[in-house]
Amino acid sequence: MNYQAVIGLEVHVQLKTDTKIFCGCSTQFGASPNSQTCPVCLGMPGALPVLNRKVVEFAIKAGLATNCRIAPRSVFARKNYFYPDLPKGYQISQFELPICQNGHLDIEVEGETKRIGITRIHMEEDAGKLVHSDIPGLGSGSGVDLNRACTPLLEIVSEPDIRSADEAVAYLKKLHQIVVYLGICDGNMEEGSFRCDANVSVMPVGSTTFGTRTETKNVNSFRFVKQAIEYEIERQIELIEEGGKVVQETRLFNPDSGETRSMRGKEEAHDYRYFPDPDLVPLVISNDWVADVALSLPELPEARRNRYRSDLGLSDYDAEVLTATREMAEYFEACLAAGAPAKGAANWVMGEVTRSLNEAGTGIADCPVTPERLTALLQLIEKGTISGKIAKTVFDEMWTNDKAPEAIVEEKGLVQVSDTGAIEKIIDEIMAANMGQVEEFRGGKEKVFGFFVGQVMRASKGKANPAVVNELLLKKLKG
């Protein structure tokens, strides 16, 4: 029997706010354990939560960018469970009335476009973190670090529309790109800023009844998500075919073995005894507020890619690379604003700029060659002042100092030679010294042409205008 996977993803997005969702404590990562806490974080009796307005704004941004309906009224609820990293004994989340509902994202897998529904986006606080290691003054054991408690999260819940690990990864990558573009999340998966719970079940092909699902918790890389889902699909099919039954449970993924293992029985919503939080009034969001937030949204990657293709004539590949990050897209846009030709700017941003950034181990936001200076360099190429090859030498010089490209060209005597008389003289000398190759060319061996071009460029120290060289050389070789 053939089986079809049914996958739904719950993505936790840690918001890039300076302070926590219900108090004024810092959200900075990596601080000393329990150094960023207060009575609210610690769940002290009588401590009252106060909602961070920036968290609501970020949630609205996420909802608009994923085509959701923004609820005019939403409610916070207490999710009750006991765990050492949850000192209150409940987590403040949203249940029946989340802030965003009924959205979607379109993904592309193997050239096919597919729409993945988004059930809801809700705001919640994160829990603390258990630390299993040597604890100063206590020896080996387990401790609780509550710095992360009350850190603001969005939980983005997809519909069970995903049918393969590849579709899941495509959806996650698109969602990750959007939240980073919006500036609401740093996207650091290693630090847990963007992590995923994968709900997986299988059913016979053609069936409309979903199988029993398992939930694999807190997978924090695209590669691990793919491995975890593929393993779980294979495990469930094998179990069913051997006459067993899939148990609804929570599982953990082991990146070393590439396998999932049982963690605990899967809870249902009623197990958490949700009820409205009496310390937080319902959140009312006006249409004007939503409209103001909508005006602040950046142009999103998909819209930008479409514009680059239709308005600038760039290829699908170029548009994809240039919009990979908001910083790169904005650098490219700044080049265009300074007067750079679109295709030339695209080639240089994807080529020399990216190469130099990778070698320096830095991001484009810290690029020492500003868009304006790069544009000035490209304009020298367009005017024929320097060749593309010489431009790379000039660019390397620009990387190490703040001189204008014109000044570097002048100082180093790199102006391109377009004087036909000077170039003809070089060609004549090279042809006279290589009559054997001249005869080969005239005998039909056209590959020899490249040899002569190389000799001329070498003799001119790379300064000869390649277009002029090709034209004159071809004319002389043909006699």
From Swiss-Prot:
Catalyzed reaction equations: L-glutamyl-tRNA(Gln) + L-glutamine + ATP + H2O = L-glutaminyl-tRNA(Gln) + L-glutamate + ADP + phosphate + H(+); L-aspartyl-tRNA(Asn) + L-glutamine + ATP + H2O = L-asparaginyl-tRNA(Asn) + L-glutamate + ADP + phosphate + 2 H(+)
Family annotation (Pfam families): GatB_N, GatB_Yqey
Keyword Protein biosynthesis among UniProt keywords: yes
Key words of the record: ATP-binding, Ligase, Nucleotide-binding, Protein biosynthesis
EC number: 6.3.5.-
Broad enzyme group: ligase
GO MF assignments: asparaginyl-tRNA synthase (glutamine-hydrolyzing) activity; ATP binding; glutaminyl-tRNA synthase (glutamine-hydrolyzing) activity
Biological process according to GO: glutaminyl-tRNAGln biosynthesis via transamidation; translation
Quaternary structure note: Heterotrimer of A, B and C subunits.
Family the entry assigns: Belongs to the GatB/GatE family. GatB subfamily.
Role played: Allows the formation of correctly charged Asn-tRNA(Asn) or Gln-tRNA(Gln) through the transamidation of misacylated Asp-tRNA(Asn) or Glu-tRNA(Gln) in organisms which lack either or both of asparaginyl-tRNA or glutaminyl-tRNA synthetases. The reaction takes place in the presence of glutamine and ATP through an activated phospho-Asp-tRNA(Asn) or phospho-Glu-tRNA(Gln).
NCBIfam families found in the cross-reference section: gatB, PRK05477.1-2, PRK05477.1-4, PRK05477.1-5
Xref: HAMAP family: GatB
The protein, known as: Aspartyl/glutamyl-tRNA(Asn/Gln) amidotransferase subunit B
Record organism: Geobacter metallireducens (strain ATCC 53774 / DSM 7210 / GS-15)
Underlying gene: gatB
